[in-house]
Amino acid sequence: MRALLVPVGLDLYAVPMDAVREVVRAPLLTRLPTAPALVLGLFNLRGEIVPLLDTPALMGLSRIHGWSFVAVVRSPLGPAGLAATALPEPVALGEAVGASESPATAGTYAVGQRLAVLLDIEALLGGASLPSHDLLPSQSMQGAG
């Protein structure tokens, strides 16, 4: 299976390539004071408003510090950005070396000498823990450019 490795500090997360739209450098963010802590803010991606999510916080882990790239993924609620501390890169995953620890993951895979947790984007980003896009500004910005 092809996946995008999303590095977050010393941890690696893998996202199935069919869920990945693109990777971008850290964008200018608009913070949302009333948003859940896992929403770092919103950014404009060529006229489309995309929430940037704290990748480890989605998994119930400590918050990210110093992110510099964003993996933009397709989710049941629309596009979402996963924060990364280094440039995400595509890889071919072999057989899983560990079972899923959470309903939002699909196993653990060996990548070189490291382990990567494969994220189930639909389960992870389709959950009730995320704000509905109805609460966020319009997905397209008229006249933005």
Feature map (PLM): residue ranges:
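An acidic, low-aromatic, low-complexity terminal/linker signal
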Residues: 1-145
